[in-house]
């Protein structure tokens, strides 16, 4: 579950390493986010050659959760870390590569570009 002040790894090649969640854009009075939710976050760690600076406010889509996710067919999926992909104003990923596996739930939420860039979909 992703809440405000949660730190997420960034799973793309934008040069940002970690972000800290400010708000989950899921709806009013929703305290947590899950896979496929958009979060507003603050950039915490960056690489020197990045277009982003420390302290920038960005939007990102959650692509991996350490908490197990129960699917309608009865299977449970969980990942080793919490990770997100930074998106632009149109909802497209800012980077050109996605590192690590992503969840199948992204396809249902309409993030086909992230699915196509990912090396593995679980």
From Swiss-Prot:
The keyword NAD appears for this protein: no
Stated name of the protein: Large ribosomal subunit protein uL14
Family matches, as PROSITE patterns: RIBOSOMAL_L14 (PS00049)
Subunit structure comment from the entry: Part of the 50S ribosomal subunit. Forms a cluster with proteins L3 and L19. In the 70S ribosome, L14 and L19 interact and together make contacts with the 16S rRNA in bridges B5 and B8.
Function: Binds to 23S rRNA. Forms part of two intersubunit bridges in the 70S ribosome.
A Pfam family this chain is assigned to: Ribosomal_L14
InterPro entries assigned to the protein according to its UniProt record, in alphabetical order: Ribosomal_uL14 (IPR000218), Ribosomal_uL14_bac-type (IPR005745), Ribosomal_uL14_CS (IPR019972), Ribosomal_uL14_sf (IPR036853)
